[in-house]
Every structure is written in C-alpha cells, then in structure tokens.
From Swiss-Prot:
It is found in: Secreted. InterPro entries: PLC-like_Pdiesterase_TIM-brl. It comes from Sicarius peruensis (Six-eyed sand spider). Transmembrane segments: none annotated. This is Dermonecrotic toxin SpeSicTox-betaIIA3i. Mg(2+) binds at E25, D27, D85. GO terms for biological process: killing of cells of another organism; lipid catabolic process.
Amino acid sequence: WIMGHMVNAIEQVDEFLDLGANAIEFDVDFDDDGVAKYTHHGIPCDCGRLCTKYAVFTEYLDYVRQVTTPGDPKFRKELVLLALDLKLQRISSEKAYAAGVDVATKLLDHYWMRGWNGGRAYILLNIPLVEDYEFIRAFKDTLRKEGHEQYNAKVGINFTGNEDLDEIREVLEKLGEDEHIWQADGITSCFPRGTERLKKALEKRDTPGYKYIPKVYAWTLVRSSIMRRSLRLGVDGVMSNYPDSVVKVLKEKEFSDKFRLATYADNPWEKFTPI
C-alpha cells in the first residue's frame, strides 16, 4: 500500500493517484464539540508541503465516494484504502465519543450512502492516542444503532502516536477488538527516526498467533534510502509525500520480485503470508 500523505484538498486526490498512490491519508479536523468539519492539517506540517489546503469534510467524502464507486465517471480502480487521520488530540478526550458518532454518521450518509451505491474502499481510522479509544466504541455503536453493521467489514483501526505497543494491545483488548488492526510507526518528514519500534511492531506481526498487528506501515517517508530501509524490514505499507518515488524504488531489482502494489482484491486486514 502506497499511502499519499496529507491529501486534504479535493483536487489533490487525483493528483496523488496519478503519482502512483493506491491509498490516501487525509486529516479530519473537529470543532470543540467533536463535529468533523474539514479535511485540514494546519501549521506546522511536513517540510516542503503546504499545510493549509482543505475541503469541507462531507464534500470530500462525496468526492472520494465517486472515485471509489465502480461505474461512476470519476472511478479510479487503484484507490482501495482511505486513511482518516483523526485530529482528536485537538479536542477534549471527553468529546472522543461524540466525534466517533459524527464521523460514522457522515460516512454512512456521504460515503456508504447507507447501502445505495456507496464507495467500496476500505477505511482506516487513524487515532492519535490510546486515550481517545472511546472514538472507536462510538463509531461501532453508531453503525449498530443505524442498522449498518455490515460496514464493520470495511473498517480498520490504527493508533498512530508511537505509543507502547503493549499499551495499545491492552486498549484493543478492552474494546474487544482483535481484527482489522494496522500499526503505524513514524514521524514527520522533517526529522529522522530510528527503526527500533518499527522492528518491534514487525516482530509482533510475524509472531504466530499474535492477532493485534496484521499490518504495519512506516510514515512519512520522502528519501528513497529510508523507503528502501523500510522495505527491507518488510513493511506492508509506506506513507509518503512522493508516491512516485515509492513506485520507482519498488521497481528496483532488489524489490520488484518481492513486492507489488495492493489491489482491491487484497484484504488489508489479513496478515500477508508469502507463498
């Protein structure tokens, strides 16, 4: 999975897909009551990027629905995963539940269309800190109350704050979640980051019987040397400001027979087992 990073304006969606991304990450900004208003990162953000691009959240969902709906004139078959970077750290953790209700409702109304020809992409809920776990409970509660639990099959969870992996597992256990989990490891592209925690996450992923990390990705990679380092370790995904650079690295002899781009036929919740 090549995740285009910080794809917050509607016109950027096709731009990043044209560069080779098959997944996009966008920032969801909330008001003080936990209502998702905009896809917007704000200042500061990654080096070399414009931090202020944005769209109205519901309009953005309407657009990516078209891009991920077969038969729609805007359909792009390569876009298979949407990662919502939920900016919950900007609001009180008491509002995390309200935020979960709001995001689930907006996805039902604007993306899934409550079963009426909605978008098909998988959804990854990127939650900054384990203290905001009530968001997940609220999201699942809302799908159940609205009679649309079938969409749970399309939704995954990812804690992105580089917290202790065992603490994350404990929170997932508390929530009763042991499926559809990704684990991110990384830092803004402005700073270097070692591989200690990334290696630990990959080790857990590869431990037989360990359910809490089937997929691991590294972010935000801009240098080809760091992309190669992550691929050598065996990550499932790379988030980058430059998807075309990732595509180039994947074509190199060292990687071309080990990796391929994920398609809609690949289940993002299953641990990859080499043949």
